[in-house]
Amino acid sequence: MATGAGAGAATVVSAFTGLKSTAQFPSSFKMSNAAAEWEQKTTSNGGRVRCMQVWPPFGNPKFETLSYLPTLTEEQLVKEVEYLLRNKWVPCLEFDLEGSISRKYNRSPGYYDGRYWVMWKLPMFGCTEASQVINEVRECAKAYPKAFIRVIGFDNVRQVQCISFIVHKPE
């Protein structure tokens, strides 16, 4: 369940109620045999399912993996970084003042639309301990307290980004 912390208020999502049986509808709403046969041959769009709701995006931005969860504790952050290192990924820190995609000067996507964050120092090649990454996060947060900071794990063999999560949000 989401908890409200910040500008957006949390909304409670109702429990899954499932599909309703047509037995409770009046006979005028019941399908003819032809309609029932057609329904059996086609897929349902789930129109009677009431559990699907949209996360309210206004004043409640979400950023990366794990961003729907509460802020990571120090212990949870260490576990995530250890997972990253255990998979032999190279940790890298990035920071940005906005933390989300924003297009100020043009409608089409491009380099300056907020997708690319500023890299904090160099990727941490040869990093073997989570404490090294945590110390860099602290140092970056001290230098840029009003910035969003994320940790990225790169696989330098496949040359892809494998994990990315926010580790610091501005107050």
From Swiss-Prot:
Identify the stretch annotated as signal peptide in this record. none
Keyword Chloroplast applies = yes
Q: Among its keywords, does the record have Ligase?
A: no
UniProt xrefs under Pfam families: RuBisCO_small
Q: Show the transit peptide stretch.
A: 1-50
What terms describe the molecular function in GO for this protein? ribulose-bisphosphate carboxylase activity
GO BP term, pick one = photorespiration
Subunit notes for this chain?
A: Heterohexadecamer of 8 large and 8 small subunits.
Q: What else is known?
A: The basic functional RuBisCO is composed of a large chain homodimer in a 'head-to-tail' conformation. In form I RuBisCO this homodimer is arranged in a barrel-like tetramer with the small subunits forming a tetrameric 'cap' on each end of the 'barrel'.
The family assignment reads:
Belongs to the RuBisCO small chain family.
Q: What is this protein called?
A: Ribulose bisphosphate carboxylase small subunit, chloroplastic
Species of the source: Pinus thunbergii
